[in-house]
């Protein structure tokens, strides 16, 4: 035990030994275990729990609190303060002079940290800030590593002199009536754990249930509980929940945020119905919610826990929809939409068309009769589809890799996912040490890099070939085809004949790209280079033909790692020794790409046109863009880093981040429109399997009788509405609303009219839902052979 009373400066108390142990000081032993054993044995000079019972357990005159409640029991006779020794034989007829109980003040030096190591904090034992709080308790709780500080800033400072009837003395009396449990508590992983929510409260532990009840009686009879706080706590022991008890089982509680996020989905309906652990709240929403909190009490492993109900109490004035879940567009999306006639129930046509195109390309296949040169299977890949025109047979090499290359879309038979295969024609791999570089490339995951998945050799194409497998991004196009496919864009840099004058100077929005788009590309390309260089590699493919554009502005660097394999030199001891030089070349290549984008022409990066290209950049773009291009293209004596251009990008990075987040908001809004469509389609599919079924269980009229007849009339109510003039009434919102009401089973009544208009049936949606579920389950049972 680490809590007790500090020794009094009185000589009588200092010299007296409790429970027949002469010379022991009036202070709890720090080494006294719960199994009633002490580290120092009989030679211990401090107070033990069983000795405390010898002092306090023989009195029969309880001290009463000012409120009239029972308190601790102490011996009646009083020993004179001036005596040096206590008569051990007559100890039962004597009472120790404890400072604070006889009107004396409790010295500040006597209030050690060990005094406040019990589980009760504050006057009322639950961290109430309404009465005196000792400074050392604040230090104790602040230095505690097991729980946060539970004190309130409004706590009053400690007064030097406390009378007998003061709150401090009353608290001292309350502690005297406590009996500390001697039962050793061990963790119980199988027990249900009650973890109270955090708040400005205390911890309750190491107490028996009987002592808790005795303490609560004295507690609620105290005058300090007569205020508003006490009125809220007294009726139902409604104590504010505190932090986790000291001896709670050492297992993750079921109320932990992480497991609840994985296993629990909030249900608005639970907020409207009171649970068995709570009572209805009659106050309005504007009233403090603390008055409606219900404190639950449970004992686990001998430890008593108090916790609040985790289910939110029902609040009057809050009504959630029970069937209609199509809210209007969020205002931050509605005001940024350029189109006023945006669809309400479905995603935008532009996004839908883009997704459909990606799906078409992903599922595309070829006719093997028309392309016999494409094998049906390569290694573990099948269903090859060329993504670019196949090279002619007489083609020798390409300007990028020095070999003939071709690109295919294929499906991996191991995971049934589409991949992009880049084939290097006629290459024979003679040194497998380069696989270490390939493994390093496979570990790089970046949003602006096409990830390399594997590399293998094959003869499926009729010759030795090296194949690189990358992630497949359907619908992507190269930067070359997007921005540099216009021959007229090079007119500004072509030489004029004698007597011809230069054409008009290209301008932004009149032949040149917007500067914001160029900065968006710079941010993405520099981010990709930063990740590659940090991994100790070099891109070496910073070229418009190897940069993919997905959507409007999304960039990805393609074909990474190919140069590292094709140019691998096995004679070098360190294969990455030349990487710093390649990284410097990446920065120059990035500068050429940015200059070509600024000129909107590849002719601008030629050496003879550099001066003219920089003049074009100076006239049309900001000085920051010009300085960035000059920095990347100018060779310097020191080693440069891609991080050096970050100050040049500056606040434009935040502009790109803002644009990306706004784009994400628009896509999420489009996704929200499609969330319920799958559910409604399943309802229609089930309804279609029931209606107009020709025969079931040898009954031709099965779909025309019983519950099925109601569903048939409901189908007419959904789709066959007519106006007063007899013309068809087509309203999609009516269909969606009725299906949602059917799925929810609302008690709303509708009238179903037969086709001959001789019968009118008034039913509720809940009745229709019951008929719908029973009928469909009957069909499912028959399909599974259970009927």
From Swiss-Prot:
UniProt motif (PABPC-interacting motif-2 (PAM-2)) ranges: 185-200
GO aspect biological process, one term: nuclear-transcribed mRNA poly(A) tail shortening
TM spans (from-to): none
Annotated Gene Ontology cellular component terms: P-body; PAN complex
Region (Disordered): 1-20, 131-162, 179-210, 226-291
Compositional bias segments (type: Low complexity): 11-20, 143-154, 200-210
Keywords: ATP-binding, Coiled coil, Cytoplasm, Metal-binding, mRNA processing, Nucleotide-binding, Zinc, Zinc-finger
Pfam family, one: Pan3_PK
Quaternary assembly: Homodimer. Forms a heterotrimer with a catalytic subunit pan2 to form the poly(A)-nuclease (PAN) deadenylation complex. Interacts (via PAM-2 motif) with poly(A)-binding protein pabpc1 (via PABC domain), conferring substrate specificity of the enzyme complex. Interacts with the GW182 family proteins tnrc6a, tnrc6b and tnrc6c.
Function of the molecule: Regulatory subunit of the poly(A)-nuclease (PAN) deadenylation complex, one of two cytoplasmic mRNA deadenylases involved in general and miRNA-mediated mRNA turnover. PAN specifically shortens poly(A) tails of RNA and the activity is stimulated by poly(A)-binding protein (PABP). PAN deadenylation is followed by rapid degradation of the shortened mRNA tails by the CCR4-NOT complex.
Protein known as: PAN2-PAN3 deadenylation complex subunit pan3
Organism: Xenopus tropicalis
């Amino acid at each position: 035990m680490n809590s007790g009373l500090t020794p009094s400066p009185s000589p009588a108390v200092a010299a007296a030994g409790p429970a027949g142990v002469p010379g022991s000081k009036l202070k709890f032993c720090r080494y006294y275990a719960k199994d009633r054993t002490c580290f120092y044995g009989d030679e211990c000079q401090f107070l033990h729990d069983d000795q405390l019972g010898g002092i306090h357990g023989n009195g029969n005159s309880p001290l009463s609190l000012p409120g009239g409640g029972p308190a601790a029991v102490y011996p009646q006779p009083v020993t004179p303060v001036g005596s040096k020794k206590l008569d051990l034989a007559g100890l039962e007829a004597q009472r120790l002079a404890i400072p604070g109980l006889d009107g004396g003040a409790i010295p500040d030096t006597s209030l050690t940290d060990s005094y406040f190591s019990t589980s009760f904090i504050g006057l009322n034992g639950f961290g109430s800030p309404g009465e005196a709080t000792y400074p050392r308790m604040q230090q104790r709780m602040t230095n505690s590593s097991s729980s946060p500080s539970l004190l309130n800033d409004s706590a009053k400072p400690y007064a030097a002199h406390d009378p007998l009837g003061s709150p401090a003395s009353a608290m001292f009396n309350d502690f005297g009536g406590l009996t500390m449990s001697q039962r050793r508590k061990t963790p119980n992983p199988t027990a249900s754990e009650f973890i109270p929510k955090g708040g400005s409260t205390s911890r309750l532990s190491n107490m028996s249930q009987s002592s808790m009840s005795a303490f609560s009686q004295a507690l609620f009879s105290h005058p300090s509980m007569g205020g508003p706080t006490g009125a809220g706590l007294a009726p139902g022991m409604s104590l504010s929940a505190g932090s986790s008890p000291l001896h709670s089982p050492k297992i993750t509680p079921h109320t932990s945020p992480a497991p609840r996020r994985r296993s629990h989905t909030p249900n608005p309906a639970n907020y409207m119905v009171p649970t068995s652990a709570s009572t209805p709240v009659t106050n309005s929403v504007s009233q403090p919610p603390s008055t409606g909190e219900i404190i639950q009490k449970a004992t686990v492993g001998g430890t008593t826990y108090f916790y609040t109900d985790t289910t939110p109490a029902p609040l009057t004035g809050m009504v959630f929809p029970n069937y209609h879940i199509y809210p209007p567009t969020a205002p931050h999306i509605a005001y940024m939409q350029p189109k006023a006639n945006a669809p309400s129930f479905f995603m935008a046509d532009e996004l839908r068309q883009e997704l459909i195109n990606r799906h078409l390309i992903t599922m595309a296949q070829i006719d093997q009769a028309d392309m016999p040169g494409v094998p049906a299977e390569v290694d573990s890949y099948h269903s090859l589809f060329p993504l670019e025109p196949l090279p002619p047979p007489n083609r020798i090499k390409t300007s990028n890799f020095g070999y003939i290359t071709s690109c295919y879309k294929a499906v991996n038979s191991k995971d049934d996912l589409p991949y992009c295969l880049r084939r290097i024609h006629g290459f024979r791999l003679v040194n497998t040490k380069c696989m270490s570089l390939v493994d390093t490339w496979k570990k790089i995951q970046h949003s602006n890099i096409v990830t390399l998945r594997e590399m293998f050799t094959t003869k499926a194409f009729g010759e030795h070939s090296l194949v690189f497998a990358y992630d497949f991004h359907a619908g992507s196009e190269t930067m070359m085809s997007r921005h540099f496919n216009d021959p007229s864009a090079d007119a500004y840099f072509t030489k004029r004949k004698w007597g011809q004058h230069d054409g008009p100077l290209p301008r932004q929005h009149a032949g040149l790209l917007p500067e914001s788009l160029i900065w968006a590309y710079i941010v993405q390309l520099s981010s990709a280079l930063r990740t590659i260089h940090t991994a100790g590699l070099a891109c070496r493919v910073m070229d418009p033909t190897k940069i993919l554009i997905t959507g409007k502005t999304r960039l990805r660097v393609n074909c990474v790692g190919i140069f590292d394999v094709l140019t691998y030199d096995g004679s070098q001891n360190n294969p990455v020794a030349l990487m710093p030089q390649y990284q410097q070349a990446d920065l120059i290549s990035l500068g050429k790409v940015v200059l070509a984008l600024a000129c909107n022409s590849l002719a601008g990066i030629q050496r003879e046109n550099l001066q003219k290209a920089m003049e074009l950049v100076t006239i049309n773009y900001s000085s920051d863009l010009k300085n960035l291009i000059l920095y990347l293209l100018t060779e310097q004596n020191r080693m440069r880093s891609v991080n050096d251009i970050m100050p040049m990008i500056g606040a434009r990075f935040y502009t790109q981040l803002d644009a990306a987040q706004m784009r994400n908001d628009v896509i999420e809004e489009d996704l929200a429109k499609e969330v319920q469509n799958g559910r409604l389609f399943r309802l229609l599919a089930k309804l279609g399997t029931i209606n107009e079924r020709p025969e079931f269980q040898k009954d031709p009229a099965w779909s025309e009788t019983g519950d099925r007849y109601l569903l048939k009339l409901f189908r007419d109510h959904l789709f066959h509405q007519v106006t007063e003039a007899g013309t068809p009434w087509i309203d999609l919102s009516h269909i969606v609303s009725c299906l949602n009401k059917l799925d929810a089973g609302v008690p709303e009544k509708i009238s179903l009219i037969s086709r001959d208009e001789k019968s009118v049936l008034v039913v509720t949606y809940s009745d229709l839902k019951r008929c719908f579920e029973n009928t469909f389950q009957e069909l499912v049972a028959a399909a599974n052979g259970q009927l």
